[in-house]
Amino acid sequence: MSNVNDNSNDDVVLIDVYNIIYRAYHGNKNLLTNEKGIPTNALYTTIKMLEKIPDMFSNMRFCLAVFDGGSNNFRKELDPNYKAHRKPMPEELVVQMPYIKEAFRILGWPMLFAKNEEADDIIGTLAKRSGNAGFNTYIISGDKDFRQLVNGRINVIDTMHDICYDEDKVKEKMGVEPKLVVSYLALLGDSSDNVMGVDGVGDKTAAKLLNEYGSMDSIRQNQDKIKGKVGENIRKAFENGQIEKSMQLITLKTDVELHLKNKDMKKQPRNDIEWVEFCKEMNFKSFLNKMPKM
């Protein structure tokens, strides 16, 4: 990407697609269908979210929608229980996936399908790369793991709750600075990814310990000073390697080898002819009504 000094007014937008569509699916309980009986609730809500993005980022220079591939990776090797509790994608969502991908294509969003890496690590790598190049970088996701990346150039946007996580918002919501998010989640645990925390440590205790000692290394060095059952459980979690493993699971990679060129991350104009046909097929009259007369 270009020189830092050239990019300070330009935005890079990275979309965590599976996070968005799962939240769209569960957030819209009205099981919409088209005339063929195909469910469309997640598709409809995802498109509504996509419609907002160009207005949110008027200086969007590059963007990418990243789809998870579902393959095994180093985290599964490190802990076979990682995400093991997750149920298969609901059938009502499975049947919508081809249409969701088609909507992204027709609307002109560049896409990347993760294969041997998690989408989170690809997004983490691109965010770090674009932030270092001086771009204002925005990750569209409700996944709290991304908050570890937040800095003066990287923000996380939770579109479902209309929250922009900059450094101050991370501190407000989690009680710790972004640089301590990995340690915070390792103490607390992350049920969404089946990552173990320390028994008896809740969000307030995790934040208190990290703010008091300043880092996980400092907590390790001073673990004998932590009293009560919490101290006992922390010492046990250090001794059996649980904390170290949890931190490895939570830490996003920012060095994934990617062969993307600038042109691979440029949004294209919507194909209006295809879009009209798509909306008719899906029975999306509200989107058709927004179209200029052709």
Task: Please annotate each region the language model reported.
Residues 144-145, 204:
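Acidic, divalent-metal-coordinating active-site segment for phosphoryl/phosphodiester hydrolysis
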Residues 137-143, 283:
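Conserved RecA-like ASCE P-loop NTPase motor core of nucleic-acid helicases/translocases
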Residues 2-137, 146-155, 159-164, 244-245, ...:
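Noncatalytic, basic helical substrate-engagement surface that gates or grips nucleic-acid strands
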